Amino acid sequence: MSIGNIVQCIGAVVDIEFPRDAMPKVYDALVLEDSSDASFAEKGLTFEVQQQLGDGVVRTIALGSSDGLRRGMAVKSTGAPISVPVGHGTLGRIMDVLGRPIDEAGPIASDELRAIHQKAPKFDELSPSVDLLETGIKVIDLVCPFAKGGKVGLFGGAGVGKTVNMMELINNIAKQHSGLSVFAGVGERTREGNDFYHEMKDSNVLDKVAMVFGQMNEPPGNRLRVALTGLTMAERFRDEGRDILFFVDNIYRYTLAGTEVSALLGRMPSAVGYQPTLAEEMGKLQERITSTKTGSITSIQAVYVPADDLTDPSPATTFLHLDSTVVLSRDIAALGIYPAVDPLDSTSRQLDPQVVGTEHYEVARRVQQTLQRYKELRDIIAILGMDELSPEDKLAVSRARKIQRFLSQPFHVAEVFTGSPGKYVPLKETIRGFKMLVDGECDHLPEQAFYMVGSIDEAFEKAKKLQ
């Protein structure tokens, strides 16, 4: 246990000098020593070594507020990386990046600690899955189905409904799914974390969820490592042979925290000011979120898209790692269609006739073709009006508008705002409904009948009321 002294402090980045023969290793945790001159600093402040600068000096990131730090303060090396409690004692609890409880419910009842930096599973341990995970959300089950043990990204700009969609997925999957879940709140609003906690508590599934938060108000060091803390807890359950759900809200803030400290660590910024190690940092996290022969991790990640630009380096780097991408569109949200999922932009590796079956595949592709045709005709309609279209095109537009409305659905988590009860639509019902639409069996119904309903039978009932 060597002792060093702070030699420089710039924001969240702190340089600490140790004796040359006792330099801490990269990723080792260091702790601020209690002393009279440390009274203004955060008690027991932890640092993580990022670089060895030579001559006994290491460059670290403070995992907490660096207010009150000054040169000469004593810092002790722990000789090991940051370790957090794992196992069943973490269920039903809210923790911070270091695994300390923040829910005022006493200490975490777990004796087992695990380092947050782990190697990704070896290639021969991996176990890809082709089993589908039913979500009960029509547009997702039809166009971009999820795989058990797969990785899903919810992409969207500010205010198009990423968190609401994620909450609905948690509601539909975590409550129906008897397994365990881990939720990592990375740089998001504290209110959302609070809502999530109460949502879980009210539905009596709190004892199956472990929650880790490093929210918007936390220093960048916390936001940079909190995703790894949550993942370490999920990995422990997976290695026990369980099927785990791992929710991350929001993966973009993980990148952003890295960007905030990157320049202070002396790295040259790359495109759009991101850190030059963007792809490597993302890969380190994503390669660990995987299913092995022992157990599986199904991960659902919200990804903020800066200025609605999907080519921004951060979302573009995240795309590469995912099995399904659910793209939320501002144009669809503007039409009042929620969930605002873009069925033409969203993709899934599972949408393959050998995985989902021929019927599902053909219905999904026909729905996309109809919507694509409508998209192409929209300019003509705007300039010349509907009358100039051929009868086939008029029919395609009419069906596309019905499909567009039928892709909307009332959510359980939004009942308080909409006043209409949430709907869970089984996959078979979803396929049956859209097959009837593209086959022309609903051509006589008004398009309002399809807005905010669950199954196709509800649309028929609504049409009767409208007449």
Swiss-Prot record:
<keyword id="KW-0375">Hydrogen ion transport</keyword>
<dbReference type="Pfam" id="PF02874">
    <property type="entry name" value="ATP-synt_ab_N"/>
</dbReference>
<dbReference type="InterPro" id="IPR004100">
    <property type="entry name" value="ATPase_F1/V1/A1_a/bsu_N"/>
</dbReference>
<comment type="function">
    <text>Produces ATP from ADP in the presence of a proton gradient across the membrane. The catalytic sites are hosted primarily by the beta subunits.</text>
</comment>
<keyword id="KW-0472">Membrane</keyword>
<dbReference type="InterPro" id="IPR024034">
    <property type="entry name" value="ATPase_F1/V1_b/a_C"/>
</dbReference>
<keyword id="KW-0139">CF(1)</keyword>
<keyword id="KW-0813">Transport</keyword>
<dbReference type="GO" id="GO:0045259">
    <property type="term" value="C:proton-transporting ATP synthase complex"/>
</dbReference>
<dbReference type="Pfam" id="PF22919">
    <property type="entry name" value="ATP-synt_VA_C"/>
</dbReference>
<dbReference type="InterPro" id="IPR027417">
    <property type="entry name" value="P-loop_NTPase"/>
</dbReference>
<dbReference type="InterPro" id="IPR003593">
    <property type="entry name" value="AAA+_ATPase"/>
</dbReference>
<keyword id="KW-1003">Cell membrane</keyword>
<comment type="subunit">
    <text>F-type ATPases have 2 components, CF(1) - the catalytic core - and CF(0) - the membrane proton channel. CF(1) has five subunits: alpha(3), beta(3), gamma(1), delta(1), epsilon(1). CF(0) has three main subunits: a(1), b(2) and c(9-12). The alpha and beta chains form an alternating ring which encloses part of the gamma chain. CF(1) is attached to CF(0) by a central stalk formed by the gamma and epsilon chains, while a peripheral stalk is formed by the delta and b chains.</text>
</comment>
<dbReference type="InterPro" id="IPR020003">
    <property type="entry name" value="ATPase_a/bsu_AS"/>
</dbReference>
<dbReference type="InterPro" id="IPR055190">
    <property type="entry name" value="ATP-synt_VA_C"/>
</dbReference>
<dbReference type="GO" id="GO:0016887">
    <property type="term" value="F:ATP hydrolysis activity"/>
</dbReference>
<dbReference type="GO" id="GO:0046933">
    <property type="term" value="F:proton-transporting ATP synthase activity, rotational mechanism"/>
</dbReference>
<dbReference type="InterPro" id="IPR050053">
    <property type="entry name" value="ATPase_alpha/beta_chains"/>
</dbReference>
<dbReference type="GO" id="GO:0005524">
    <property type="term" value="F:ATP binding"/>
</dbReference>
<keyword id="KW-0067">ATP-binding</keyword>
<dbReference type="InterPro" id="IPR000194">
    <property type="entry name" value="ATPase_F1/V1/A1_a/bsu_nucl-bd"/>
</dbReference>
<keyword id="KW-0547">Nucleotide-binding</keyword>
<dbReference type="InterPro" id="IPR036121">
    <property type="entry name" value="ATPase_F1/V1/A1_a/bsu_N_sf"/>
</dbReference>
<dbReference type="Pfam" id="PF00006">
    <property type="entry name" value="ATP-synt_ab"/>
</dbReference>
<keyword id="KW-0406">Ion transport</keyword>
<keyword id="KW-0066">ATP synthesis</keyword>
<protein>
    <recommendedName>
        <fullName>ATP synthase subunit beta</fullName>
        <ecNumber>7.1.2.2</ecNumber>
    </recommendedName>
</protein>
<feature type="binding site">
    <location>
        <begin position="156"/>
        <end position="163"/>
    </location>
    <ligand>
        <name>ATP</name>
    </ligand>
</feature>
<dbReference type="GO" id="GO:0005886">
    <property type="term" value="C:plasma membrane"/>
</dbReference>
<keyword id="KW-0997">Cell inner membrane</keyword>
<keyword id="KW-1278">Translocase</keyword>
<comment type="similarity">
    <text>Belongs to the ATPase alpha/beta chains family.</text>
</comment>
<dbReference type="InterPro" id="IPR005722">
    <property type="entry name" value="ATP_synth_F1_bsu"/>
</dbReference>
